[in-house]
Amino acid sequence: MSEMTVDGKNVKTEYETDANYNGSVTGTEANPMGYLIDKVFKTGGNATVENTETLWKNSSTALREFATKLSAKTLTSSVADNHKTDFKSGNATTGANECKQGFWFLMDTTADPKGTVNANAIESQSIPMLLATKLVNPTDQDAPDYAGATANLGTVTLKANEPSINKEITKVNKADADSKTKMNARIGDTITYTLTTTIPDYTGYVDGSRVLQLIDTAAHGLKDVTVTKVKVGDTELNEDADADNNGYVLKRDKNQIDPLDNCNKADATVTTVDLAHYVNTNDNIASGATVTVTLTAVVDSDAVIAGVGNPNTVELAYSRTPSGEKHQVPGPTVRVYTYDFSIYKTNMAGDTALSGAQFAIARVDSNAETFMTQDAATKAWKNLTTAKPAADADEGVFTTSADGKIAMSGLPAGEYHVYEIKAPDGYTSIGLPDFKFTITPTFDTAGTTVTSVAYEKTTNTDGNRVSFGTGETASMAQIKNAKNLTELPMTGDLGIKVFVTVGVLLMAAGAAFALSARMRA
């Protein structure tokens, strides 16, 4: 009471001078609680104290302030056994608790009740409150309430919040995601994630101790994690918490041990959006409003290929008790997957690796082809155009090295078209192979870990000069080159291509010979 003021007046001082309630003034029995109920807890218009629904939901009312301060006092000092009793919600079948008639202070002391939505969640405790017992009718002990009582005395509904947080993949580059929990991506792609939770009702929670943090952990294959927007409802918050009440603090730690599956490198990125400033200093907290955090990450060359993918998790840290006890609850894990592909160039016998062969690769989407290039240093992919690159072009040309190989790691599942655009030195350029293929993963029963990846040709126009390996070489396409026409198969589509090409060359040669002969004549 001594810590409370109403209308600028100290409540304890006012009580001590009121002869109607302070027994020391008149020598009668002291009634401090009666004074509080009659003089302090009533709202404007002299409303009766039993109309408390709005009073309890408003942290600024005297009734709420008194309960909050009494709760803090109770936590730091002992209460005699003869002045307290244990109440239990839903006791027996009626929910009734036996206690002395009077006015009781009710404080939730439930320890770590587990949530029903998430086994790791812990429901927040109900706020402290003041509650009157039912009034006993002195002439009829079996009557439920004293005759003429208008208030619903002796009953309270305790509402414990079970906090939760959600996370979704919403975009890959500029395209909407086709799944909210797992996505295919290339190295170099930018992934957009959306985190959502709800602002709790902090009525009765001590200012300065309220906790609300959204904690994002990105696996080591996801870099450049950037928070692009934080909103409460439709209001965008500022990163600088000191700017105004609509602020938050952003914390980043890039040297955390990755707790996700088999990703154990010590460079996972932990990003914390701390809303402590908003929930502790804002007088108009939007309780029940949706908190939306948008962030991006880039798939880089450290990305896990297939397997468990590249997970991204989220946790919510919140105040479990009105005194500010903190607890964390996990949200869903979302994953980004990427896959290997490589080329191995050989002679027709398959026993000699060939360097200097040039290729182009296009992503096929509904028969539309978009050619791609890959940065040699970062391994990041980017789109070019629908036009096939020419041999020796600056972008989009992949050349076999001395071992005859080209690594094209970091591709999403889907369909591709590979073109050989330049033969190795000493090999014919007639009928250069091109082929389409698909990358198709198979997941475990949980749908989170890739157990196998199938690489399959979807065209057969190469004269069986292209084949995928098995086991460890399943992602490698062996492509054979012929030195001359006699090594090329002359059946099927390839045979037609060769005959047409040779025919065109012969026609061109014949036309040139005829022109030369005419000029000599």
Where are these regions (language model features)?
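Solvent-exposed loop/turn and edge beta-strand elements of beta-rich ligand-binding domains
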Residues: 1-521
